[in-house]
Amino acid sequence: MQSNDENIYFPANQYVNAGQYSPLQQSFSQNSQYDLFDGFAEFGFLEQVPATNMYSGSQSTQMEQNYLPNVNNSTRKRKAPGQNEQATVKRRQIGIEKWRLPSRSVVQPSADISDLRRPPISYVALCALACRNAPDMKITPAGVYAFVLHHWRYYRYANENWKNSVRHQLSSKEHFDEETFQPDPSNPTVRRKFYIVKNPNMIRQNLISDADFDFFRKDSRGIEFYQKMFAGQIGLPRSLFYQIIGNGIPFLAGPENSSMFYQLLGMGKVVGYLETRYFREHYRSEHAATEPKYEEDYANFTEKIPSNAENLMSYGAATERNFQKFDFTDEEIELFHLNISSYHSVQKTCKECNLPNWCTPSVGDVETYVFGRQVPMPVNTPVILQQFETVAEQEGIRNNPLEERKTTEDPRDISILEALA
C-alpha cells in the first residue's frame, strides 16, 4: 500500500493517469452534454450548481483523447434552453464535488451475463425482506433498490423495469402501510415516504411463497443466510455508496465494491470522476454472505451535503491519528476483492471489541490480515489486534484470528495468508 499525499486533490481533467484504468473508464466526447440519470432524484441527493459542462472548451481533455469513444450527439435527447434549463441544472452534479457519474449510455458492463436468470423470488418478498432489515422496519423505495442490488447480482444487469414492480408492491397497500416524513427540517416543502410492512412477525407466513423457500434452499449462500434476513440480522447496505455509485452504475453494486469504496474513503482517498479501477463486476456468483451488519441512520443527503469529503466522519478513519493519504496498487485491489471475506472478518472482530471505527479497519490491519503481509505493527493499530498478536505468539497461532473464513467452500475467499502458506 502506498502513501499518496500528492495525488488526492486534482482538477477534473487530471483524474486519469495513463495505463491505470480499466475499460470501464469511459466518458463524454468533447461536445457531449452529460447528465445524471433520473434515478438519483429519489435520493434527494442532487446539488444545484451552475450549468457548466466540465468538459466544455475548444480543446478536448487528455482523458478524451486517450480513452474515450465518440458519442454521437444526434442520438441523445437534449432539453431546450429557457424554462427547461433549471431541470437540467438540477442533474448536473451529485454529492461530493469530486464524485460524479457519467450517463449510462457511455458506461457499459463488460461481463458476459448471458447465463444470468432472474431469481424466482417474488417482488413482494424482496420488499418485505428489505423492510425487515431496515431501521425501525421502515424503508424508502430507494432503500429497497439498494438492498436488491446488493444481494442479487441479476438485478445489476436487468432492465430497470423491476423497480416499477417494487414501487407497485410498496404502494399497493395490501401488504405495506405508508408514512410520510420530512428529510430536511429546514425545507418543509420536501416530503418523502417510508413504507412499513404490515404484520412484520408474519412475513414468512404471509409474504413468502413455497417457490421462494425453494429458491432460498438452492441459493449458494444457504438457507442460513435467508434465516438471518428473516430475523433482520443482515441490515441495509450503507447508503452513501449506493447514492453515489451503486444505483448510478448498478453493475458495480454489491458488498465487495461497497467495502472498497468506504475503505478508500477511510484512507483519505476520494474516488474521482469515473475512477473505477478500484471496482469489479462480481457476476460469476453471489457474494459470500460474510458482511457484518451496519447500523446506519437514514441518510439525509440534500442540497446541503458537504462539498468536500473531509467533512464526512469516515474520511481518514483508517489512518487514525497518524493521518496520511494512502492508495491501493493494482495488485492490492485484486487482493482486496479476492479476499473480501477476511476483510469482513476483521470488521467483525473490531466490532465485537466496540472499536469506534470498526467499519473501516486501519491501514495496518488491511496490510496484515487481508493482504497477508508481515509488516511491523503500526502505532495506530487497534488494541484488540495488538492483543491478538501477543496471544497468537503464546498459543502458536499465526495471524489468523478470523476462523470463520475457513468455513467457505469458495477458493476465491481463502485468505491470502493461507494461500501463501
UniProtKB/Swiss-Prot annotation:
Tell me which domain of life the UniProt entry assigns to the organism this sequence originates from.
Answer: Eukaryota
PROSITE patterns the UniProt entry points to? FORK_HEAD_2, FORK_HEAD_3
InterPro entries per record: Fork_head_dom (IPR001766), FOX_domain-containing (IPR050211), TF_fork_head_CS_2 (IPR030456), WH-like_DNA-bd_sf (IPR036388), WH_DNA-bd_sf (IPR036390)
- Cross-referenced CDD domains: FH_FOX
- Primary role: Transcription factor. Regulates expression of a class of small RNAs, known as 21U-RNAs, perhaps acting redundantly with fkh-3 and fkh-5.
Q: Which UniProt keywords apply?
A: DNA-binding, Nucleus, Transcription
Q: Which organism is it from?
A: Caenorhabditis elegans
Keyword DNA-binding assigned to the entry: answer is yes
DNA-binding region, as residue ranges, is located at: 118-218
Q: Name one GO biological process term.
A: anatomical structure morphogenesis
Q: Where in the cell is it found?
A: Nucleus
Would you tell me the protein name for this molecule? Forkhead box protein fkh-4
Instruction: Give this protein's Gene Ontology molecular function annotations.
Output: DNA-binding transcription factor activity, RNA polymerase II-specific; RNA polymerase II cis-regulatory region sequence-specific DNA binding
* Knockout consequences: RNAi-mediated knockdown causes significant reduction in the expression of 21U-RNAs, upon simultaneous knockdown of fkh-3 and fkh-5.
Name the gene: fkh-4
GO annotation, cellular component aspect = nucleus
Database matches in SMART domains: FH (SM00339)
The signal peptide here is: none
